Amino acid sequence: RHVTLHNVSVGGNCCIENIQNYIANYEIGSDTFIENVDIILVDRLSTFGNGVEVAVLNETGGREVLMNDKLSAHQAYILALYRHRPELINRMKSIADYYSNKHASAVGSIGNHVMILNTGSIKNVRIGDYCHICGTCRLSNGSVNSNVTAPVHIGHGVICDDFIISSGSKVDDGTMLTRCFVGQSCKLGHNYSASDSLFFSNCQGENGEACAIFAGPFTVTHHKSTLLIAGMFSFMNAGSGSNQSNHMYKLGPIHQGTMERGAKTTSDSYILWPARVGAFSLVMGRHVNHADTSNLPFSYLIEQRNTTYLVPGVNLRSVGTIRDAQKWPKRDKRKDPNRLDYINYNLLSPYTIQKMFKGRSILKELKRVSGETSEIYSYQSAKIKNSSLNNGIRFYEIAIHKFLGNSIIKRLEGINFQTNEEIRQRLKPDTEIGLGEWVDVSGLIAPKSEIDRLLDGIENGTVNRLKSINASFAEMHENYYTYEWTWAYHKIQEFYGLDPETITAQDIIGIVKAWQQAVVGLDKMVYEDAKKEFSLSSMTGFGADGSHDEMKLDFEQVRGDFESNTFVTAVLKHIEDKTALGNELIKRIEAIES
């Protein structure tokens, strides 16, 4: 009723009514409901958002990523950052162009079981099965890749131009997107506005603003006063009022920065790009000195009187870091069996541990050069206090013991060894792949050698399809633990000074005991850190109008008591479990004669 259709095919069991203008050049699937819409049309040969250039990281261009339906965070990372390999970039662009042209059409499609209700203009948009579009203002030149396993919801007041929205995502409540890619199971709402940005799996954006950002998996920003601009993030939480500057009022907005995985910002933090913040670090205050702390992960960056103070490694003992690592896998909302991004959640991996080895060397060298009694050390335009430096070396060594011990226990589990030779054979890696440097390609942790092998394949033309590129990333993700052991075994020899030909059960027992000390020591620090949340100062403001006892009672009713807190009991259980795990291996091999 009240519908004008031009060059439209309609599937079975559809209801289309009250279209103010018309629907033109569309194929509409079955069981679809379209009501109270202004106009739906395709007015030219369209690629539906595929092939649109997104000027990510550098607002003035130079790092453009070509959007496509199959875009993964890892593919985009290489396209944006590996500009030192122009042949690779040209090949990747032509692969993306081939895909875009293959899917170009002058006829749009609306899938099966789609609902489009009370919506304004839909122009040059391809809409997948089971999609809900309700109260949306305008959609122009894009793809909504909804499907039965992971429907997409686009809600009231949304305006999207030049976009792709992947399966399972929800874009709602006045969100405005221009030249944006939205990955799987993202949630954007509450008037969020973004331009020239890429959001990959499980990102959340509410209230604030994004410009030219590369938001890797689990980038979360919830606050009205937060602007993320020209930065690369992943597993990141932005505090309210966090922003960055990419403009120094000289040659325009040409600067960019990186916050490596797990870095987060406190309220009112500010960073003047260019800068690079190490993995799992916390940024507090205003930082204008362009520090690069990528080799000092798990740090605090604190500003005092316009100076950046660095507290290396301290975040390793933070209860918040452990809580973050536990929550990300639980918050992976992707239901689509065909996942675009391969996400490695490990807190300690060859990627972070290699940085700790470097960090430990840097701190020891600072100590040697400036002298052990120096009160303040300078590194990368940041200051490090003497006590912080010594603690940093200790924290990094604890984490290295923990990671290498974990690896060796995993490698030797479930086998009853009779001789040292059997142990040596089991310790030998299954592959040479994994030696050398490792990289975090926006969520995927892999040996640099494997990434380079893929890039060489793209350059010489042996890898020439989007699905082949994604299959290579899948293979690296699949083989992570095999590659990890190759790297870990090499580091075990180096760190503990062992020879693979003469390693004995007693050497292994020594490593396991060091591991037990590290794990229990770290857990105790985390336990003490959690205890601070139950201190008297944390009770301030509880028990309104009451006495001291009522304050404690009110606090316990709301927050529970320390000993029965679920996180605290989990830490205590972790200490027990890990001690038992180490003892089990020691018992299994202690009888072997040297």
Q: What is each PLM-predicted segment?
A:
Residues 2-3, 100-103, 107, 120, ...:
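Surface-exposed loop/turn motifs in large extracellular/passenger domains
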Residues 37, 304-593:
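Long, compositionally biased intrinsically disordered regions
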